[in-house]
Amino acid sequence: GLGDVYKRQQMNKSIIFSGFGGQGILFAGKLIAYCGMIEEREVSWIPSYGPEMRGGTANCSVNISDAPISSPLFVNPDYLIIMNSPSYRRFIDKVKSDGKAFIDSSMIEEKCEREDIQSYYVPATALAEKNGIAGMANIILCGKLLKETGIIDIESVESALKKIIPASKETLVGLNLKALDIGMKI
């Protein structure tokens, strides 16, 4: 109905994904951005490549909007997915008031003191290892993001994974969906 159309028009969310290079940070951001494209929204995905990439901290910024994105660069995200302590320290204070932070509590011991945001502590790295999908903590956190924000439809994820993952590695599609499901159930 018209109400739904109106609600959709108001969607304009920004997300920062951050962690060590090698934790699949850029992939997670690309996946969410791709889902936005499948849903015919405006999206931007800006990876930060820099001296910190190898072994250091990698991050990317994603916008998903129903209106044209005037500037894909932002400082204060609505949502934050963080997978290491340096990222936690760098970004936790930048989340918008009323925003949400998704924290890999297997990797980050800090607890958020802010009362104006919602923090979700997900032992994503431990859960991935326990479920035989080591290296997919990033997607477990994406599942939790979807569950708590509804930013994209779960159905879009399978289509996006099939586009992003090369055919030679298509077994990874099912493993990613398993990781997503674990995150959605937490």
Where are these regions (language model features)?
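Active-site cofactor/cluster-binding pocket
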Residues: Q10-I186
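Short, small-residue-biased leader/transition segments that mark boundaries at the very start
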Residues: G1-Y6
